[in-house]
From Swiss-Prot:
Superkingdom of source: Archaea
Protein known as: Protein LS215_2104
Organism: Saccharolobus islandicus (strain L.S.2.15 / Lassen #1) (Sulfolobus islandicus)
Disulfide links within the chain: none
Domain AMMECR1: 15-209
Length: 227
């Protein structure tokens, strides 16, 4: 094993997932001077490999959850443990969609870490074939046009919102600040990737689960079942 190689999601297990969640929570708590994160304490060789990851924060209020921040990296610029620590801080304090996380919210925050495979461009002769090629519940998508437009949606997102493949493509275009049908434009690059999700079951990191994107339940269906 060569230190610095890209982490493969097949290498990851519950123990690694627990470390990643712990790193993310400690990184956030450190900003409030409630904990100290020393990455040298995490000397597992897999964590020292370069990695791609996103950290998602959800705020739990009674029986509902809402997004509180999500930031990540799709370039292998640092070891996985460092990527997760940086993404956690950014999700908590630098996501432009939200105000910075407050100390009194920590007890309501569920942390989710998604480790990604390297994105690969999808090349097709006929752009209308794209919805037949991508797989909801398996693929995450990146849409890029030039240097000004880029949007990414994680594999779990279309499952949560009950999207089909064409809607998934359109929503990723919108995320890139492009028209919903941008995926039909040959100058637009479409990339896909896979991911494995580690998630806290409650806001303290004491218990985590491993989630496949295909296992994510549609939030719309859950809402309908409550009526």
């Amino acid at each position: 094993m060569i230190q610095g190689d890209l982490v493969q999601i097949q290498e990851l297990n519950n123990e690694i997932g627990r470390f990643l969640i712990e790193i993310a929570r400690k990184a956030i708590k450190e900003e409030f001077k409630l904990d100290k994160l020393d990455l040298s304490n995490y000397n597992n060789p897999i964590l020292d490999k370069k990695g791609l990851a996103f950290v998602t924060l959800e705020k739990i209020t009674y029986n509902t959850s809402s997004l509180r921040g999500c930031i990540g990296y799709v370039e292998a610029v640092a070891p996985l443990k460092q990527i997760v620590a940086s993404a956690a801080k950014a999700a908590a304090f630098s996501d432009p969609r939200f105000n910075p996380l407050q100390k009194d919210e920590l007890s309501e925050i569920i942390i989710e870490v998604t480790v990604l495979t390297k994105p690969e461009e999808i090349k097709v002769k006929d752009r209308w074939d794209l919805p037949k090629i991508i797989k909801v519940g398996e693929d995450g998508l990146i849409v890029e046009k030039g240097i000004l437009h880029s949007g990414l949606l994680l594999p779990q997102v279309p499952m949560e919102y009950c999207w089909d493949e064409e809607t998934f493509l359109a929503e990723t275009c919108i995320k890139a600040s492009l028209e919903p049908d941008c995926w039909l434009d040959n100058s637009v690059r479409i990339k896909r990737f896979h991911g494995i999700i580690f998630r806290e079951t409650r806001p303290d990191g004491s218990d985590i689960i491993v989630v496949k994107p295909s296992d994510i339940k549609c939030k719309l269906n859950e809402l309908l079942n409550n009526f």
